[in-house]
Swiss-Prot record:
GO terms for cellular component: cytosol; nucleus. It catalyses: [E1 NEDD8-activating enzyme]-S-[NEDD8 protein]-yl-L-cysteine + [E2 NEDD8-conjugating enzyme]-L-cysteine = [E1 NEDD8-activating enzyme]-L-cysteine + [E2 NEDD8-conjugating enzyme]-S-[NEDD8-protein]-yl-L-cysteine. Pfam families: UQ_con. This is Nedd8-conjugating enzyme UbcE2M. The active site is at C108. It comes from Drosophila melanogaster. One of its GO terms (biological process) is protein neddylation. Interacts with Uba3. Residues 26-170 form the UBC core domain. The keyword RNA-binding does not apply. Pathway: Protein modification; protein neddylation. One of its GO terms (molecular function) is NEDD8 conjugating enzyme activity.
Length: 181
């Protein structure tokens, strides 16, 4: 009787593990599809530190115009097992003076929050992030100080961005150099 109970429990445990693996498999299949369909602009590149782990990767954006021209910004992507029903977690690893990216690397992009839906993909996020560098949005800021400066004194904002990208202090915050050249 005890052996029968043990066998039933093992079977149940095996089924639960199988269903968990199916969820991960669905996320892996979808991310594989998204990566195969990536159409990166020449200002973006991906890096997979572990080629066997497609759920964790880096996106490097190097804008060729706008305030952030000639900068190099690295974003870490962490894709969860509920992808595409939940968006990936995206953080900026490069500290940047930007209204929509806070000093901890959190990114304010609507499709990473309330506007996410399963028909969106990694390509959508790449273009959204790239757009943030071309057109920072002071109306929906994470870095309120940068947003205020952008709204009230565009020239000062541009100077602050350049100073931060060269490696310097803006206010009390020191930024590492992130220039390509």
């Amino acid at each position: 009787m005890i052996k029968l109970f043990t066998l039933k429990q093992q079977k149940k445990d095996g089924e639960q593990k199988g269903s968990q693996q199916k969820k991960a498999s669905a996320a892996q299949l979808r991310i594989q599809k998204d990566i195969n369909e990536l159409n990166l602009p020449n200002t973006c590149a991906t890096d997979f530190p572990d080629p066997n782990d497609l759920l964790n990767f880096k996106l490097i954006i190097s804008p060729d115009e706008g305030f952030y021209r000639d900068g190099r910004f690295v974003f870490n992507f962490r894709v969860g097992s509920n992808y595409p029903h939940e968006p990936p977690k995206v953080k900026c690893a490069t500290q940047v003076y930007h209204p929509n990216i806070d000093l901890d690397g959190n990114v304010c992009l609507n499709i990473l929050r309330e506007d996410w839906n399963p028909v969106l993909n990694i390509n959508s996020i790449v273009y959204g992030l790239q757009f943030l560098f071309l057109e920072p949005n002071p109306e929906d800021p994470l870095n309120k100080e940068a947003a205020d400066v952008l709204q009230t004194n565009r020239r000062q904002f541009e100077n602050n961005v350049k100073k931060a990208m060269r490696g310097g202090c803006v206010g009390e915050t020191y930024f590492e150099c992130c220039l390509l050249k």
